[in-house]
């Protein structure tokens, strides 16, 4: 073997690497713009680009010294660095959540480890005043060996940490050869079991830093914030001591403090009347470290974070983290994430009211945190540790106690892993210690708890007592051991029910409560943002939460014939061990198009809310949910009053003043119309330009219904009370059919089902297939557990049968009285139904359904009718909640209004197709082809869905690009639908959102019409 077996040695994580240090980019002169443009530094030489590459199925196949200078690599392929070799067509993609993709046999990994050999030639020219050269790798998965000009330079692991090598003595003037051997797995892979696609290669930047012999090696900036000043302490470490001038400037370039380092490298400076950094006003100062031959410019923010009386305070104010978990993921580049891609994510997060990010579950590229400093995000920086795999080991006794005991003992509580775990925490802290945006250190994710994490926490708290710590897996412990939690500041939980949170706050509450993951955003969902918001703001000990997660993880494989991107998830690449589409759990699609769940989050976390409004005297109370900004400085508030969806009055509220976390009283007197559904909408727009946000950007809205004499929707009333036409209806029947015929229509009712199988109106065919009573929906990802009960109850195979059909006819029309049931093979009757149809001479159909569910059965997915309308009926007008999909527990981003759309545009195109596109709290809907159509209306609010796809088609296929359109416009009119929730990885749907009624009545009318 060409290389030593460091990759299976827990005592060797690194060989010949430099000690970990803070991140910075030096230059020969002062440069202020290196955060997003570090390539502009004359001391920074980027080695990215086209490299020679050879993939090997096994490390044992690497038999030749490819790293030797002059080795013939003409037979090698060419790849782009940074990159991951799976995206370049080598090896295969694999998505797995918890299970290791290899046997659990630490520290050993499979003998035939796939690996990649990289070779790159580059020019290097030594500078007289910067004669030292340091080779930096910011991200390599999983471990790697390095050679420069054929000479061994070192070894390192920990994929998301920077590895730095002193290669001064290995470089030649002029052309040089850099060679790297990257292994897919190493002993560290047992700590790299993050929920993501597993990818390999050099996935972050590679560069040289040219540096003087005598210069700063490392520095640590800490601050002591007082009422009117801040003491800035710089603790510097030198390669060799050198006098360093230190200047601190405010954002406008004015010098606020300056000094020179003492011999011991320690300097304290005082800044008077400091502006403190926070996510709403990310005010940064510049620190300029000037040495004879080098200048380092860094940016610092002054801020405090502390816990008092079990409450988290930031700059002395109670804080709520409005956070999201973010992975590095792109469908085209994999783990490779550019500054532009990061900026796009941060912009979208700002636009949707996030103020915090958890770097799940590893440190991001170092400039990510500098960008969070600048754009205003509080960050949980998380160590590159997840050892979730031992949780899945085979156990005879599968109790919680044994499960946690076995999970803990394998890695977290095995001293053999102490060095590796502490190393990963130290690499993170040392690199990122000077970033003001980082307010919390996380020891990792889902790795159980034990002595090794106690050591990591103890080191972290000793090194940096000013930040808080969290580690959710501390609760997964061996019950036979008493652990030390003194260095853990928060009680962190993933996906607890609201009742669990209530119980903790009532019975324990010893630490602030953090929802480190909540509201699992998989597919159509989440349906519980508002309820968690209310819980978070109910108790000061709740410091907020981080939604799981930011983006769907998928791999793009070109474009299908229908123009849709072929996104692949777990199992689509032929891998045996995988977790399906569980990686498709983001608030944005892989290309960053927002899900409706992101829109829901945005409006739930709007900066202002209506507390109350006295319609009589016009007195309104608003609450400011901002942590630092007064409303008068942050938002302009506009109002609109609508009548049945049309604006009748609008304007702007004046003099809205409210300090953070307090109320404002304003006056808004409105002339409310006597008739129609009247809604008042407040729209909150950004008053000032902010990082990543333009002035005038809409931050959210409030909507409230106003009282009046007749609050019925006037168009719905017209449909319900339209003048009857005098005429006659001919009734014919046989054993199977009941035929109703009048001047303008012919309706055929199937006597076996009690439902219409054909509808002709004004010479046009309205339906292509028989009407159905519908209790099924294409299961959402959040239905993954309840759907097992639904399928056990055979809801997915239910159909309608009739027992009795009675027909009465009088001068008002035809009355059809029916006794029906919803049944399915092998199970008892699901629903017993009494139904009445009334058909008027003008073709209007009035329906009354009274249904009783067998108590043995689980909650229904939905109940309503399904019609397969003529496909040319593709235009929708409705009054209800829109414009995006809305459900009983997922409608905070929607408002009541009059909306128009094409049917095809109402489809929410989830990558794994599922129930979508419903609209909640509707009064009426009209579906037309431009000339004729059908109206569905009810005295009571209903939900509807109009789609080009059947629910069977949505359930049949695994990917959206496989969908085949129906020959009909599929129209579902629902009395009710079960809530959406977030049960894909969270609690059950809350009781108040369940469709658990055992008896209910549904009244509606169907009215065919011809325009004009």
What are these regions (language model features)?
Residues 1-39, 96-98, 151, 190, ...:
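Extended substrate-binding grooves/exosites of carbohydrate-active enzymes
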Residues 48-115, 180-212, 310, 387-398, ...:
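Core domains of carbohydrate- and sulfate-ester-processing enzymes
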Residues 2-18, 37-38, 52-56, 84-88, ...:
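Accessory beta-strand-rich segments of carbohydrate-active enzymes
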Residues 172-175, 235-307, 678-715:
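Extended acidic/polar, glycine-enriched regions
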Residues 260-272, 645-675:
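Intrinsically disordered, low-complexity Pro/Gly/Ser/Thr-rich segments with frequent PxxP/GP/PP motifs
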Residues 213-240, 595-635, 721-735, 849:
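Surface beta-strand/loop "capping" patches
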Residues 84-87, 92, 99-108, 157-159, ...:
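An acidic-aromatic loop/edge-strand motif
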Residues 87-89, 184, 278, 669-676, ...:
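Beta-strand/loop-rich accessory regions of lumenal/periplasmic or secreted enzymes
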């Amino acid at each position: 073997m060409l290389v030593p077996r460091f990759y299976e040695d827990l005592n060797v994580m690194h060989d010949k690497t430099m000690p970990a240090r803070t991140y910075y980019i030096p230059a020969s002169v002062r440069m202020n713009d290196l955060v997003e443009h570090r390539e502009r530094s004359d001391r920074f030489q980027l080695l990215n680009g086209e490299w020679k590459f050879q993939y090997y199925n096994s490390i044992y196949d690497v038999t030749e010294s490819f790293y030797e200078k002059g080795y013939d690599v003409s037979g090698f392929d060419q790849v782009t660095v940074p990159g991951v070799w799976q995206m370049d067509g080598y090896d295969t993609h694999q998505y797995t959540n918890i299970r290791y993709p290899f046997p659990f046999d630490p520290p050993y990994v499979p003998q035939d480890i796939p690996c990649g050999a990289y070779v790159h030639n580059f020019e290097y020219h030594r500078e007289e005043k910067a004669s030292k050269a340091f080779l930096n790798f910011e991200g390599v998965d999983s471990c790697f060996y390095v050679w420069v000009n054929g000479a061994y330079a070192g070894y390192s692991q920990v994929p998301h940490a920077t590895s730095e090598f002193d290669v001064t003595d290995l470089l030649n003037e002029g052309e040089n050869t850099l060679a790297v051997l990257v292994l897919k797995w190493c002993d560290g892979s047992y700590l790299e079991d993050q929920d993501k696609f597993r990818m390999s290669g050099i996935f972050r930047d590679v560069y040289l830093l040219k540096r003087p012999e005598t210069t700063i090696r490392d520095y640590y900036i800490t601050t002591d914030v007082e009422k009117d000043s801040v003491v800035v302490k710089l603790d510097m470490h030198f390669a060799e001591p050198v006098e360093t001038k230190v200047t601190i400037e405010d954002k406008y370039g004015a010098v606020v403090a300056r000094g020179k380092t003492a011999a011991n490298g320690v300097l304290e400076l005082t800044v008077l009347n400091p502006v403190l950094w926070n996510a709403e006003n990310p005010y940064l100062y510049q620190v300029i470290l000037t040495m004879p031959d080098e200048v380092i410019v860094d940016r610092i923010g002054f801020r405090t974070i502390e816990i008092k009386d079990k409450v988290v305070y930031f700059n002395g104010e109670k804080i709520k983290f409005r956070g999201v978990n973010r992975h590095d993921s792109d469908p085209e580049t994999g783990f490779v994430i550019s500054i532009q891609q990061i900026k796009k994510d941060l912009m979208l997060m700002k636009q949707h009211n996030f103020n915090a990010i958890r770097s799940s579950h590893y440190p991001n590229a170092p400039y990510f945190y500098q960008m969070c400093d600048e754009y205003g995000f509080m960050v949980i920086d998380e160590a590159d540790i997840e050892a979730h795999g031992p949780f899945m080991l085979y156990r005879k006794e599968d109790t919680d106690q044994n499960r946690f005991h076995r999970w803990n003992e394998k890695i977290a509580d095995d001293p053999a892993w102490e060095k590796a775990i502490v190393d990963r925490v130290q690499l993170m802290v040392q690199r990122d210690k000077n970033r003001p945006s980082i307010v919390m250190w996380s020891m990792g994710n889902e790795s159980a708890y034990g002595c090794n994490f106690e050591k990591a926490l103890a080191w972290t708290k000793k090194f940096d007592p000013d930040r808080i710590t969290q580690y959710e897996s501390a609760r997964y412990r061996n019950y036979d051991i008493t652990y030390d939690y003194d260095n853990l500041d928060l009680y962190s939980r993933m996906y607890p029910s609201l009742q669990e949170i209530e119980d903790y706050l009532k019975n324990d509450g010893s630490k602030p409560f953090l929802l480190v993951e909540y509201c699992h955003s998989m597919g159509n969902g989440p349906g519980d943002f508002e309820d968690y918001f209310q819980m978070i703001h109910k108790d000061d000990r709740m410091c907020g939460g981080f939604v799981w997660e930011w983006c769907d993880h998928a791999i793009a494989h070109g474009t299908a014939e229908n123009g849709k991107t072929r996104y692949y998830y777990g199992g689509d690449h032929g891998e045996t061990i995988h977790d399906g589409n569980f990686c498709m759990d983001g608030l944005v699609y892989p290309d960053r198009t927002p899900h409706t769940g992101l829109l829901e989050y945005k409006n739930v976390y709007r900066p202002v809310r209506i507390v109350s409004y006295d319609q009589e005297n016009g007195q309104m109370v608003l609450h400011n949910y901002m942590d630092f900004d007064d409303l008068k400085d942050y938002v302009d508030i506009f109002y609109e009053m609508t009548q049945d969806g049309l604006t009748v009055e609008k304007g702007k509220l004046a003099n809205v003043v409210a300090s953070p976390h307090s109320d404002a009283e304003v006056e808004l007197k409105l002339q409310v119309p006597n008739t129609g559904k009247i809604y008042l909408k407040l729209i909150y727009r950004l008053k000032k330009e902010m990082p990543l946000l333009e002035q005038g950007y809409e931050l959210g809205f409030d909507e409230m219904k106003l009282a009046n004499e007749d609050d019925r929707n006037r168009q719905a009333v017209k449909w319900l009370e339209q003048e009857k036409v005098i005429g006659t209806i001919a009734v014919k029947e046989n054993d199977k059919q009941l035929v109703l015929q009048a001047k303008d229509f012919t309706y055929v009712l199937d006597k076996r089902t009690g439902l219409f199988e054909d509808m002709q109106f004004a010479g046009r065919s309205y339906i292509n297939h028989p009407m159905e009573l519908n209790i099924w929906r294409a299961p959402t990802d959040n239905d993954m557990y309840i759907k097992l009960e639904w399928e056990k109850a055979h809801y997915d195979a239910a159909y309608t049968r009739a027992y009795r059909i009675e027909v009465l006819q009088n001068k008002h029309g035809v009355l059809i009285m029916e006794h029906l049931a919803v049944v399915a093979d092998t199970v008892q009757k699901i629903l017993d139904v009494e139904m009445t149809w009334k058909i008027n001479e003008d073709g209007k159909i009035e329906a009354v359904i009274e249904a009783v569910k067998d108590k043995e059965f689980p909650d229904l997915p939905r109940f309503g009718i399904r019609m397969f309308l003529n496909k040319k009926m593709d235009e929708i007008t409705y009054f209800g909640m829109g414009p995006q999909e809305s459900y009983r527990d997922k409608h905070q981003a929607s408002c009541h209004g009059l909306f128009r759309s094409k049917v095809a545009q109402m489809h929410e195109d989830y990558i794994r197709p599922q129930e979508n596109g419903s609209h909640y709290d509707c009064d009426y809907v009209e579906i037309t082809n431009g000339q004729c159509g059908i109206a569905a209306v009810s005295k009571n609010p209903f939900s509807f869905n109009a789609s080009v796809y059947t629910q069977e088609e949505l359930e049949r296929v695994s990917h959206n690009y496989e969908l085949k359109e129906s020959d009909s416009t599929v129209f579902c009119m629902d009395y009710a639908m079960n809530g959406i929730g977030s049960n894909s990885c969270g609690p059950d749907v809350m009781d108040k959102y369940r469709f658990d009624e055992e008896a209910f009545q549904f009244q509606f009318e169907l009215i065919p019409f011809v325009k004009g």
